């Protein structure tokens, strides 16, 4: 049986909002992810809180006050936002560090702004993967690869997404992510076999299948690779005890570095023997093998 061609996975450190609205901290995180962790890409998030939130949601208190960066939830979200010029600065800094910049886009104003930056890829989060106008905009105006998470998404919704991309001639530019939307996700809810299901259902048509994890540790990510994930995304922080709701389900630099290392090593190991007795085995065979 021929050896499968298992490419090294593309590893994404999701900085998201773990920078706490601090541009200098965001740059330190990029540097750590690129030089120490040796990931392939760093990813942020771009939102327009006034567009995403109703007045009631905007003016409500943060549901977890100890993690709030503002008097209301809307002010909290505004505090964590970088404007598009700052995103451009982060993209340039990432390039200097030798790592790809990307961001999730949550709404129309954010998507229109990020399209102008022309990153290699953008991400549609699970929360907005049914925002048809947003998907249409990216299909029409964004020339790069479009990543999309399928957390909290029904099969019917998933099929509508795939049909839209197929109808717009962009299915080959789509990366579908198996994902469970929870922070953190217990192991029994990770549902890794979704990676295999997506590969079997769409693997011949989409650009790739990925895995976006919000669990603890790195074992599940390596298993996702073995099941066919070509992109692996994990939240990244410099300190899991920092203020903010995403830090607890994030990897610190040591963990992200080990994840990138283990994924690349396991990718090398995912093969059949190309010959019945490997060269590395021959000396031991000559010395130890029982001869009938």
Predicted segments with their positions:
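Catalytic cores and adjacent flexible loops of soluble metabolic enzymes
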Residues: 1-292
């Amino acid at each position: 049986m021929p050896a499968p061609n298992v490419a090294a996975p593309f590893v994404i450190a999701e900085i998201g909002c773990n920078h706490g609205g601090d541009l200098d901290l965001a740059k330190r995180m990029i540097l750590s992810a690129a030089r120490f962790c040796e990931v392939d890409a760093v990813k942020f998030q771009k939102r327009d809180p006034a567009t995403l939130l109703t007045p009631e949601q905007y003016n409500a208190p943060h549901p977890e006050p100890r993690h709030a960066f503002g008097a209301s939830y809307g002010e909290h979200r505004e505090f964590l936002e970088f404007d598009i010029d700052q995103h451009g600065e982060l993209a340039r800094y990432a390039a200097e560090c030798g790592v790809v910049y990307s961001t999730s886009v949550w709404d129309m104003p954010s998507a229109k702004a990020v399209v102008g930056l022309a990153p290699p890829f953008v991400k549609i989060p699970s929360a907005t993967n049914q925002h048809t106008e947003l998907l249409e905009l990216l299909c029409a105006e964004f020339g790069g690869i479009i990543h999309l998470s399928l957390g909290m998404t029904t099969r019917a919704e998933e099929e509508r997404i795939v049909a839209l991309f197929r109808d717009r001639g962009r299915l080959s530019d789509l990366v579908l992510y198996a994902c469970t939307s929870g922070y953190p996700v217990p192991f029994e809810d990770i549902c890794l076999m979704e990676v295999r299901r997506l590969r079997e259902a769409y693997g011949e048509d989409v650009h790739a299948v990925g895995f976006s994890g919000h669990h603890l540790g790195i074992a599940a990510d390596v298993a996702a690779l073995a099941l066919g994930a070509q992109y692996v995304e994990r939240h990244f922080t410099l300190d899991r005890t920092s203020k903010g709701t995403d830090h607890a389900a994030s990897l610190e630099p040591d963990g992200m570095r080990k994840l990138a290392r283990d994924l690349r090593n396991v990718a090398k190991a995912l093969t059949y023997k190309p010959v019945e007795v490997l060269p590395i085995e021959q000396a031991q065979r000559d010395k130890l093998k029982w001869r009938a």
